[in-house]
């Protein structure tokens, strides 16, 4: 334990020293886009993006990561629900960054960018400036401003606001369909997200709008061309993500089937007894009313761009009503 603490302290001191002492990168330096495979937690299901700055001459090998957040922030969950979560830029030695993902069995793919010495140094200086205490925090937005969009727009700004890519990927897919792809079509997380998302989530995305997703950014950059029509990436280990499937017993469809079976049995019992069980209505009705209140609150008071009322919210009461018709129809 103490060994790990000493290693971590040494890594932090190394980062601080590198950021403070190095003014300009040498001609041997390179900058890479790092893309991390998805993890098991919901917030990690979409993967992650970071920038690596490596200069063997200075020597420097640091990874800049726009995905740092603090659970201990005052009222963190309240702010997260409202879409008012502040993330920040973090920096670690690359070996430490890689080690943390190896421990989670999550591959990290690297794309070395084709940049001039001036462009590399401009990005390096911009990252150093962004890491200043007064600059490192930003208001996170899952779709428009996250760990993937920040590196992309920084690169875009430095090389001249022009990147051409023939990557089409899943052309025509909507926000909802993409998120279902990463969360798993049959997971409870996807079912919950579907209920919270409104009509805005059903808009088809352009190639650039999809770049908030780390995998899409990785694949987009892999065949991208600079303004001078030279490849944007000169060396790459990029590989499409492998999304694990959901076991049938953990799927929301299985849970819904149990729910319907439960209602059918109660309806048959009520019909035999000639007596309506109001308790079952209360038992299932209160959670649904709470869900409507949550969606209503998020629709009017949340900064999340895709949240809103949608027809999928009607699935629960319609399913409930159709099942209870066993009692009503004689």
Give the positions of each predicted feature:
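Glycine-rich catalytic cores of cysteine/serine-nucleophile enzymes that process amide/ester linkages
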Residues: 27-106
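Bacterial Sec-dependent N-terminal signal peptides
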Residues: 1-24
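A cross-kingdom signal targeting lumenal/periplasmic-facing segments of multi-pass membrane
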Residues: 70-161
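Activation targets extended, charge/polar-rich intrinsically disordered C-terminal tails
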Residues: 129-326, 330
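Well-ordered beta-strand positions in beta-sheet-rich domains
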Residues: 7, 61-63, 110-112
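Intrinsic-disorder-associated interaction segments
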Residues: 2-5, 9, 116, 186, ...
């Amino acid at each position: 334990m103490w060994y790990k603490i000493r290693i971590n302290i040494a890594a932090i001191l190394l980062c601080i020293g590198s950021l403070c002492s190095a003014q300009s990168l040498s001609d041997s330096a390179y900058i890479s886009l790092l893309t991390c495979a998805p993890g098991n937690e919901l917030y990690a299901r979409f993967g992650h993006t970071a920038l690596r700055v490596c200069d063997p001459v200075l020597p420097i090998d640091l990874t800049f990561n726009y995905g740092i957040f603090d659970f201990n922030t005052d009222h963190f969950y309240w702010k997260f629900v409202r879409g008012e979560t502040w993330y920040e830029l973090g920096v670690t030695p690359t070996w430490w960054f890689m080690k943390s993902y190896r421990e989670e069995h999550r591959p990290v793919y690297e794309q070395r960018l084709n940049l001039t010495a001036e462009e590399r140094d401009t990005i390096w200086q911009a990252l150093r400036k962004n890491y200043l205490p007064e600059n490192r925090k930003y208001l996170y937005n899952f779709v428009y401003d996250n760990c993937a969009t920040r590196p992309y727009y920084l690169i875009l700004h430095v090389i001249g606001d022009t990147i051409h890519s023939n990557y089409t990927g899943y052309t025509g897919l909507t926000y909802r369909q993409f998120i279902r792809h990463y969360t798993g079509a049959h997971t409870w997380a996807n079912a919950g997200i579907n209920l919270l998302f409104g009509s805005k989530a059903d808009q088809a995305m352009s190639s650039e709008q999809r770049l908030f997703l780390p995998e899409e950014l990785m694949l987009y950059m892999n065949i991208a061309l600079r303004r001078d029509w030279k490849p944007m990436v000169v060396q790459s280990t990029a590989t499409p993500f492998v999304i694990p499937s959901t076991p049938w017993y953990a799927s929301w469809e299985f849970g819904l089937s149990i729910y319907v079976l439960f209602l059918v049995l109660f309806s048959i019992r009520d019909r035999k007894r000639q007596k309506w069980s109001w308790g079952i209505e209360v038992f299932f009705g209160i959670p649904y009313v709470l869900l409507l209140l949550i969606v209503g609150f998020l629709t009017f008071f949340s900064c999340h761009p895709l949240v809103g009322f949608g027809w999928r919210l009607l699935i629960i009461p319609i399913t409930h009503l159709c099942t209870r018709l066993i009692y009503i129809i004689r």
